[in-house]
Amino acid sequence: NNEINKPPYKLPNGVIHLEDKKSTETLIFIGTVQNFESLIHQAESNTLYKYMGYGAGSEMFRIIRQEKRASYDPRSHFSQIGEKLAFLGLSATVGSDRWDEIYSLMFDIHNNTRMGLNTTKGLKNSHNTVINELISNLRRKPNWLVKRYLELHPEQPPKASINLELIDASFDVSVSELNNKAINILSDPSRLISIIIGGKINSRIKKDSTSYCQLPKKKPLEFCLKKLSKVQDLR
């Protein structure tokens, strides 16, 4: 979950596919850039993304790696890129002959988490991971601390002590309430962007998607992002 640069525009929804019929592996990413209503909303979302795909206890590891043996390192991503703003998603590199199966499973994991079908133990472990990660950032990542400082005090430094409210909000997350709140915490799947690199085109996914862009070879990803954004802005 390294720091990344803020994208120049809001990510559209839909599917972007760079087809490669000769590839043996396919990279799948499903996610978005999300603005949060509050810092506690951000901390709750971070906890649920940790539950979905962070480490050996996550749903992605259990289902995609252990049960399906389809990917060595399926994972979730949650990178803060501004005040109450984060780049988040799920990713996996899988065999090209079964990418569409795992693609559907990744949506199942997102949807089940969003519907609150989550274990209490798993949520507690994920919340602990969020807290430990914040503490680690404070100790070992001065660039992370500087960015959070500038978000809170863009014009001048405080006269008193610095209070990083995100840490307080993360401690205030009520794990026992997450399952009931999950449907309002995570984005509706129709609002996510899917990026698929490699493998053959799946006609069903192309047909079912209201927003589909086949990325031409040698074109940057921005080509499809702008195309989808333009179409959706006209709706």
Where are each of the predicted segments found?
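Non-catalytic, conformational "gating/processing" segments within enzyme and secreted inhibitor domains
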Residues: 1, 183-194
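A short, acidic, amphipathic alpha-helical segment used as a generic capping/interface helix at domain edges
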Residues: 173-185
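His/Glu-based metal-binding/catalytic segments typifying zinc-dependent metallopeptidases
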Residues: 2-59, 222-235
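Non-catalytic accessory/interaction domains
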Residues: 76, 195-234
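M16 family metallopeptidases and their MPP-like homologs
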Residues: 25-40, 45-49, 61-172, 189-198, ...
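Glycine-rich, charged/polar anion/phosphate-binding loops
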Residues: 11-17, 73-78, 178-180
